[in-house]
């Protein structure tokens, strides 16, 4: 029987708003040979195609692959910082999804503590190299986009549907004009600097 590989990626680390999302995706390598589409890094494909892939994975989940989504909430990001929260979410996703015989590949440079019983590797730009990580990246990206769209409907002045909460000029200008919302990560430097500037 072919080896199973688990790919792990996160989305939303650099956003000024809301949660970060971690996804772990588990399958055999041969799984990607029979897909009706090519899997690539979610940053390189358009929104419509990402959503099509996401819907396919969601509809057929559990047949010959599986995935696990973990949400790193804003309150924990502000309390423990984004790096620690993402690592803990990755650890949880691996424990919930993978078997100890699986090879686990994390996009990036860091491996969570307490993973000694698992075969875990960290690989920079793994979302460009490993299909399971690419799939995880797509799922995490679309899942987070849906969350951000819901936040946008509550706070449309910030145009989160266009900037996904990242520090674009239109987003920062909106914060200057309308202030900081309860969904902003106030410990992030661009936001904390704006808060300080607006309070003087």
Feature-to-residue mapping (PLM):
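RNase H-like, Mg2+-dependent phosphodiesterase core
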Residues: 1-200
